[in-house]
């Protein structure tokens, strides 16, 4: 599994409850751009349109070596491919207040197919963000102390 992009802001702003692997409907030049690492997941989100999941705000840069006459929109909504049961479960959860779906990372699986890991998330409050930051610092210090002790 080759990870192309991660959404670090999602881990900071949200508490991830469940994770799902989704396929993407892409065009050829977009796949080439993803392989080149020209993708950004920051400020992207998943929304349901007529019962189908789409990812909005995912920026895939235009590749210079691609056809200059055919230039797709860099921030166009891209359809996600999930099983029907997963879609129904996510629609039910996101209809509740406070839940959202955010992209976590984009990668190529063993069969060289682009996959997007999405997560069912609940927003963190300022207090939760500070608490998780303190915990992260404490873990880092503990690891450093263990390293010194060896």
From Swiss-Prot:
SUPFAM superfamilies in alphabetical order: Small protein B (SmpB)
GO biological process: trans-translation
Localization (cell): Cytoplasm
GO molecular function: RNA binding
Signal sequence residues: none
Any one Gene Ontology cellular component term annotated for this protein: cytosol
Keywords per UniProt: Cytoplasm, RNA-binding
Principal localisation: cytoplasm
Keyword Membrane found: no
Keyword RNA-binding listed: yes
InterPro entries, A to Z: SmpB, SsrA-bd_prot, SsrA-bd_prot_CS
Family label: Belongs to the SmpB family.
PANTHER family: SSRA-BINDING PROTEIN, TMRNA-BINDING COMPONENT OF TRANS-TRANSLATION TAGGING COMPLEX
Protein's job: Required for rescue of stalled ribosomes mediated by trans-translation. Binds to transfer-messenger RNA (tmRNA), required for stable association of tmRNA with ribosomes. tmRNA and SmpB together mimic tRNA shape, replacing the anticodon stem-loop with SmpB. tmRNA is encoded by the ssrA gene; the 2 termini fold to resemble tRNA(Ala) and it encodes a 'tag peptide', a short internal open reading frame. During trans-translation Ala-aminoacylated tmRNA acts like a tRNA, entering the A-site of stalled ribosomes, displacing the stalled mRNA.
Protein name, as recorded: SsrA-binding protein
């Amino acid at each position: 599994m080759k990870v192309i992009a991660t959404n670090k802001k999602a881990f900071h702003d949200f508490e991830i409850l469940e994770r799902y692997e989704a396929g993407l409907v892409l065009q050829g030049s977009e796949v080439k751009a993803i392989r080149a690492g020209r993708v950004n997941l920051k400020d992207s989100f998943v929304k349901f349109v007529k019962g189908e999941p789409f990812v909005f705000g995912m920026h895939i840069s235009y590749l210079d070596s691609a056809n200059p006459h055919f230039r797709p929109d860099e921030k166009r909504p891209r359809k996600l491919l999930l099983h029907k049961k997963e879609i129904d479960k996510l629609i039910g959860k996101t209809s509740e207040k406070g839940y959202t779906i955010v992209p976590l990372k984009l990668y190529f699986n063993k069969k060289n197919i682009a996959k997007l890991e999405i997560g069912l998330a609940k927003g963190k409050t300022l207090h939760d963000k500070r608490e998780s930051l303190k915990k992260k610092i404490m873990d880092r210090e503990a690891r450093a102390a263990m390293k010194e002790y060896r």
